[in-house]
Amino acid sequence: SGRMEIDENYGRIEDIRQNLFEIFGDEAKKKNLVLQYTINVEHENILTDTTKVKEIFVNILSNAIKYTSSGGSVKVSIDELPCDEDGYMMVRTRVSDTGIGMSQEYLTNIFEAFTREQNTTKSKIAGTGLGMSIVKKYVDLLGGTINVESELGKGSTFTVTLKHRIADESYYVKKYIEESETGSEILEGRNILLAEDNDLNAEIAEAILERAGLRIERVENGI
């Protein structure tokens, strides 16, 4: 297998979370599952391999939703932990479900490619090993840890802890300027119509854009 590399880029924790919930929202609704989350982080902007981070949680959430019966719940909690390295942050993400759970025997091999849970026919598990082996590879590559707590019939909790570089707000400015394909000198003094329905995002964007000499008018959406 080819050597995997980290492609570090700018991301916001809430954007990544929102993106994942958009992917699984319909599926959860169809199964009448409660999909909920809590976020408690001091630093919102990060530099990391956002594609691999998303892939980790796509696999975990996909299994959580797949193996949780109608009327159950999947909860995601995201917390920032103290980090001993300057300029970095630790983010712990827990995904807990009320699903069918896993046997202790299966748990010990969960991250080996192509392992499958055979113990229960009602679970109809088709084989989640490949997804989990990728998850483990990506977590290792990003210098993180993953552990699983589970009991048959009582659901599972996956805990992933990853270290990300903290991005300062200049990355946010750069992103806005790159998206508008122009330099801040050209923008200075211009009026900007900011279409953003999230109050926190809007507040951050307004502060940054005003600092770059722009006049801001905000609307809730682009319609």
Language-model features, listed with the residues they occupy:
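Conserved catalytic submotifs in the C-terminal HATPase_c
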Residues: 7-12, 29, 34-44, 81
